[in-house]
Each structure stands twice: as structure tokens, then as C-alpha cells.
């Protein structure tokens, strides 16, 4: 290169999603603290006990949103194996078999261990926790990454007019992606 060049404008995928969604991501500790506030309204557990599970739950919620999964369907009571008889074409036969084995291990409510009953109690409240957590974050203008991505994707899917950052002539170059989520 023998002359000065201008660098084009660029943004990371995270920055782009934040601009498209109008939400801003928050740090993990803040998110887990907010999740605990919602969770503790339903389950009596100390923050110390919750933190490990809260981190896992936050990661699960993140994946649910990044892949545009219907949380209500996911967290429905699939202990009733008839739920698996519907249209689950997105599952392989092996996945259906594993899910059935998992839920059959619980047997009837009377034959469940204390741990299994505790798990079922939590499982049955996860959809409500998921929705309340998202509402709480939205009210504060906060979000976790998957929530940001889902909001951006839903705005675009709804044909909402969204101003994309970048070239005035509308040219965009996307680089560096390996595996994309449904939102991306």
C-alpha cells in the first residue's frame, strides 16, 4: 500500500445486536443477582447455594434465546410422555429415547426420591422464572447476551424498521463466523 487508506466502520456481533435490539448486556454477577431475586420469590434457597445453579440457569436461558426456542414448550411438564407424541420432528429418535428414559426414572410422584421431587418442583417453575427474569431485566434496561440477540432477531423478523450501523450505501461484510445461532 503506497497511499493512506481509511478503515471502514466495524462492529462486533455483540455490538450490532445491542444496537438492533435497543438493549444492553450486563455483567454476569449482576445478572445472577437479578435472577436470584426472581428465583427466591418461588424457592427458598440461600444465595450461596443458588449461585452455582444460577450460573447454569443463566447459561441455559442464554441458549434458549439465542436459538429462538419456545421456553414455555421447553419447560412444560414433559413428565407426561404423551407430550413426546406430538410433532417433535426436530428431535432424533435417540434424543426422544433419552428424554423418555430420563422422565421414566422419576416414576410416579410417590416413588420419587427427595432430590427428584425437588428437581420436579424447580422444573415446573422454570418457565415462570424465565419470563419474570426477562421482564425484570427489561424494566431495568438490562439483558443477558441471548436476550439481546433474541430481541434483535425478533425486531428483524417482525419487519420492524431498524437502522443498521455502517456504510451509507448499505454494503456490509460479515467476517469471522464459525457456527451461527438462529438469531445470528
Would you name each region that the model predicts?
Residues 2-166, 182:
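Basic/charged alpha-beta structural segments of nucleotide/phosphate-handling enzymes
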Residues 168-180:
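Conserved P-loop NTPase "ATPase switch" module shared by AAA+ and STAND
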